[in-house]
């Protein structure tokens, strides 16, 4: 019997007291007209959570789409992110993001990676890049700056009214512990946005974040750009069993695990389809949860940050 699909409407409560929709629309690699039209389509389909970032180089398109959608600003939860080259002055970076977005404030501002990047070798003035040394390795600031100093500045931003909450992204358990235990820490991150999917379930990190009152957000739920999870035979077979799309199955499984999931597409039909979810029976839920034990874990977004212990 086909599953009963319904539009996603659930929210989770942040440690600030604000609510965040559990199904968000991701905008990574959605540039130019694709970025604009996909956000328009998402808002039309019912999404009320848009996830952006300075490094995605599409904040202007995202902001224009939000304005043109006709959906009142206060009904949309909007996130953007601080890039590593701007960690020394997050307020200035946020001001630039707000200008590009055409907004007075965002609902959530994240430190995109816990890695401060040097700008010494940036010659064209464009700091929204990944600076590299002559040998091709990333030019990381390992001596004069660190994510603790960045967070000390970020935690003051909600007082300005330019963001309602601050959080982190791609933080490991050890990095979160270091942040929370730092002497000048006053604010627990509202969220930690990380890669999660059936082949990288992140059970330990999710449990740790929940214990600390940090809402987890999952990016790349289908395994990033080429969506390899949608080609997993076990996923395909189970989706057929329930009369749903593989993407709907994965999104529903993710939400059932109790965290925010960010779905991304530039295809209008898939954008609508991805917004419809259902409740998996317990045995099928466990089958998907155990896929990584059968096939092994696989991290898709495996950024190389030199010797920085990013996922340790």
Curated annotation (Swiss-Prot):
PROSITE patterns: ALDOKETO_REDUCTASE_1, ALDOKETO_REDUCTASE_2, ALDOKETO_REDUCTASE_3. GO terms for molecular function: aldose reductase (NADPH) activity; carbonyl reductase (NADPH) activity; diacetyl reductase ((S)-acetoin forming) (NAD+) activity. Its main location: cytoplasm. Induction: Is expressed during aerobic growth on glucose, and its levels are rapidly up-regulated by osmotic and oxidative stress. It comes from the Eukaryota. The active site is at residue 56. Its EC number is 1.1.1.2. Optimum pH is 5.4 with 4-nitrobenzaldehyde as substrate, but can function over a broad pH range. The record marks 81 as: Lowers pKa of active site Tyr. One of its GO terms (cellular component) is cytosol. NADP(+) binds at residues 220-274. Substrate binds at residue 112. It holds the Pfam family Aldo_ket_red. Belongs to the aldo/keto reductase family. Aldehyde reductase with broad substrate specificity, catalyzing the NADPH-dependent reduction of aldehydes into the corresponding alcohols. In vitro, displays high specific activity towards 2-methylbutanal (2-methylbutyraldehyde), as well as other aldehydes such as hexanal (a toxic lipid peroxidation product and phytoalexin), but exhibits extremely low activity as a glycerol dehydrogenase. Seems to contribute to 2-methylbutanal reduction in vivo, and may therefore play a role in isoleucine catabolism and fusel alcohol formation. Present with 14100 molecules/cell in log phase SD medium. This is Aldehyde reductase YPR1. It comes from Saccharomyces cerevisiae (strain ATCC 204508 / S288c) (Baker's yeast).
């Amino acid at each position: 019997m086909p599953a009963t699909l319904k539009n996603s409407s659930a929210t989770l409560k942040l440690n600030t007291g604000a609510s965040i929709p559990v199904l968000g629309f991701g905008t990574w690699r959605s540039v130019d007209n694709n970025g604009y039209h996909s956000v328009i389509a998402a808002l039309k389909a019912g999404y009320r959570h848009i996830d952006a970032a300075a490094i995605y180089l599409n904040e202007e398109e995202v902001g224009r789409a939000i304005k043109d959608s006709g959906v009142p600003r206060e009904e949309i939860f909007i996130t953007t992110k601080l890039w590593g080259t701007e960690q020394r002055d997050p307020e200035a970076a946020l001001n630039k993001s707000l200008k590009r977005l055409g907004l007075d404030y965002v609902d959530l501002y994240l430190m995109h990676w816990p890695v401060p990047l040097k700008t010494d070798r940036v010659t064209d003035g464009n700091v929204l890049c990944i600076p590299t040394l002559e040998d091709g390795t990333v030019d990381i600031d390992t001596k004069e700056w660190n994510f603790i100093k960045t967070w000390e500045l970020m935690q003051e931003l909600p007082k300005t009214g330019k963001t309602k909450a601050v959080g982190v992204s791609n933080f490991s358990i050890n990095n979160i512990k270091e942040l929370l235990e730092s002497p000048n820490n006053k604010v627990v991150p509202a969220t930690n946005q990380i890669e999660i999917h059936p082949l990288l379930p992140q059970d330990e990190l999710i449990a740790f974040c929940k214990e600390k009152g940090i809402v987890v957000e999952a990016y790349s739920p289908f395994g990033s750009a080429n969506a390899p999870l949608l080609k997993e035979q076990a996923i395909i077979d189970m989706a057929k069993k329930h009369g749903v799309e593989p993407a709907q199955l994965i999104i529903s499984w993710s939400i059932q695990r109790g965290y925010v999931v960010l779905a991304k597409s530039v295809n209008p039909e898939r954008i609508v389809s991805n917004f419809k979810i259902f409740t998996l029976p317990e045995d099928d839920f466990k089958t998907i949860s155990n896929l990584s034990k059968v096939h092994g874990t696989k991290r898709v977004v495996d950024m190389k940050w030199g010797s920085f212990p990013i996922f340790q």
